[in-house]
Amino acid sequence: MNKKGDEIMELIPNEPKLFELPEFADKIRLSDNVLYHLSDIIASFEDYLKLINECTNGNNIDMLYYWLDEAEEELISSCNIEKHKFVFSNKELMSGDLFFESLNISQKRIKDIHKFICEHSDSKSSLVGEYRKKPAWVGNVYQDGSVEVKWWGANIEDIEKFMKSYIEFYKKNSLKEIHANPFLKAALSHLLFVKIHPFGDGNGRVSRIIQNLSFTSGINRVYDTNLKLSPLNISTNIHMNQITYVRRINDIPFSIKDFNNDAVNRWLDFVLSMYDEQIHFQTEKLKNTQIESQNKAFLSEAIINQSEKSKINKLFK
């Protein structure tokens, strides 16, 4: 659908009809390609987890700062995907409980995450930490002023209901692979949030943070770990494959009636490829990183205060 830019407000929104997100997830039938890709990644990831344990070697503080650096790079890369600037420091990340208290989510926490990314970036959202009050569409604006609308976000009257359903999906436990496997659940958490598009700006950035929360929670459940920060961050990889990333999302109808299993599987396979790339990159990085010497400057009592020590303990215990 093409319209001149000054006519965009005259478009009649083709917004998705309200439906239950767990039902969307349960309709997914994994392709042979995704299942094969997944088994290969799991084997590589388990080797990577062993390497993490070897590098930690009982020194929790050093590993904390290593992962804080990784978290900082992830947030910056996530902003770069939509050409935003992101400015913050490890100290700011540790100053609040946004990332350390829990891997669970709620509508309040999602709004707090949105507020965090808006306050630390050049976000254009006029409603910081609040759901949008206007229709939202995703597409292209061309040099001649024409507009191509790819898809519409949820109707503003349905956002709260969609988000309630989203929380139910996020928390759902099931033996089905789409819920039980951390890689798949995280990828679908990312997709569904973007498709709801609850905020006026920052939906992609929030979705990638939620993906990391979901992934970390899933890894803890499957491997009996107690991580609070994601052991894999794929925004750098997404940024390098941005055209495919956008196409995979745009190709998926956000609907039960028009559900497209092949399109969803292409999205899952894309995200698995991003994780696969990151596993190999991080494996080599950890092998070539002397964590103790790299972070020695951080270990001063003058730098690590009592509050931060408390968070360090929460991170690993």
Located regions from the model:
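FIC/Doc superfamily catalytic core
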Residues: 1-200, 204-317
